[in-house]
């Protein structure tokens, strides 16, 4: 335990030093200095770590929250820079690999698709929303081109300039792919009836950076998505929580969803993935009662078989609570 505490303390000290250096940068636009500092930060955060960011002291928590905001801003500058670079080509989609982290998006999108088809049986999406698509909508593009060829994608971002950059990438694109990608400038909080039309909604990691903001976004989606529709939420785990917000699966459940899987990759894919399904009011109330029963009996959610070697998946709380209750009754 003492060794773990020392490891966590050393990591937090290192990250605090990087935060201090990044905070002093005159600009977060791509440059040799910016790239070097964020590379060091990612290198420090990606390996498995015993750190639990929820248990950090107030000063470290404030540092972490500010660091996530800085990461978000730097990511926006980086994506805008490469979106402009790619748009200079006659067919931008032929040059996506020039973006240094394109492979990560390919792997993350494949992971999300694999989890979706495994834990939402029979799903065959025809309408998909991606909330927080940004100027480089790689996730939607990879999903549309390689995994969901029959689906139409509506991409939402609050920034009109980001959407304009995204549209330019599809100049000269295959008519089928280009026709299936639409971009809308809107805050998710203003979307109501539109959300009920989607079979799947993907929620980007940086939409709602504070825990209460993220919970509010998820609750809004739960209030307006159709019963049975799937929600895919990007989160983080361990030290990766210094780079992206961590989403509590309980906030997803409280938002009106049945959490089907929680996956924490252990490779170069930084984001964790939560797959959930919208349930009706009656089912949500019943699930809440079962969860309360499970909590009162001390049920610990087990880890079940992973869909790949890079992650661990948490089973549905509802199913496990029911299984525990059934076994308990049989033993009485």
Curated annotation (Swiss-Prot):
Coiled coil: none annotated. GO terms for biological process: nicotianamine biosynthetic process. Keywords: S-adenosyl-L-methionine, Transferase. Its EC number is 2.5.1.43. Induction: By iron deficiency in roots and chlorotic leaves. It catalyses: 3 S-adenosyl-L-methionine = nicotianamine + 3 S-methyl-5'-thioadenosine + 3 H(+). GO terms for molecular function: nicotianamine synthase activity. Gene3D superfamilies: Vaccinia Virus protein VP39. Pfam families: NAS (PF03059). Expressed in roots. InterPro entries: Nicotian_synth (IPR004298), SAM-dependent_MTases_sf (IPR029063). PANTHER family: NICOTIANAMINE SYNTHASE 2, NICOTIANAMINE SYNTHASE 3. This is Nicotianamine synthase 1. It comes from Oryza sativa subsp. indica (Rice). The lineage of its organism: Eukaryota, Viridiplantae, Streptophyta, Embryophyta, Tracheophyta.
């Amino acid at each position: 335990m003492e060794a773990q505490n020392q490891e966590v303390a050393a990591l937090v000290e290192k990250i605090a030093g990087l935060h201090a250096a990044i905070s002093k940068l005159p600009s977060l636009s791509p440059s040799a200095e910016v790239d070097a500092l964020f590379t060091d930060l990612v290198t420090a955060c990606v390996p498995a770590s015993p750190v639990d960011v929820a248990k950090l002291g107030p000063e470290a928590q404030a540092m972490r929250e500010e660091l996530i905001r800085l990461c978000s801003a730097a990511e926006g500058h980086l994506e805008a820079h490469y979106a402009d670079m790619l748009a200079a080509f006659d067919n931008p989609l032929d040059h996506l690999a020039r973006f240094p982290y394109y492979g990560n998006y390919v792997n993350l999108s494949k992971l999300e698709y694999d989890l979706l088809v495994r834990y939402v049986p029979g799903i065959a999406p025809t309408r998909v929303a991606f909330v927080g698509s940004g100027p480089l909508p790689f996730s939607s593009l990879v999903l549309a081109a390689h995994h969901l060829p029959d689906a139409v994608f509506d991409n939402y971002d609050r920034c009109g300039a980001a959407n304009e950059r995204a549209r330019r990438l599809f100049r000269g694109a295959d008519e089928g792919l280009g026709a299936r990608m639409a971009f809308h400038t809107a805050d998710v909080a203003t979307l109501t009836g539109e959300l009920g039309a989607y079979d799947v909604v993907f929620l980007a990691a940086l939409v709602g950076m504070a825990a209460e903001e993220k919970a509010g976004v998820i609750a809004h989606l739960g209030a307006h998505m159709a019963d049975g529709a799937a929600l895919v939420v990007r989160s983080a785990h361990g030290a990766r929580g210094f780079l992206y917000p961590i989403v509590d699966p309980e906030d997803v459940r409280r938002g009106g969803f049945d959490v089907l899987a929680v996956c924490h990759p252990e490779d170069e894919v930084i984001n964790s993935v939560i797959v959930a399904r919208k349930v009706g009011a009656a089912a949500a109330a019943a699930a809440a009662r079962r969860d309360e029963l499970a909590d009162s009996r001390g049920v610990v959610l087990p880890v079940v078989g992973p869909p790949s070697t890079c992650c661990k998946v948490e089973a549905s709380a509802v199913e496990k609570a029911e299984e525990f209750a059934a076994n308990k009754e049989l033993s009485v």
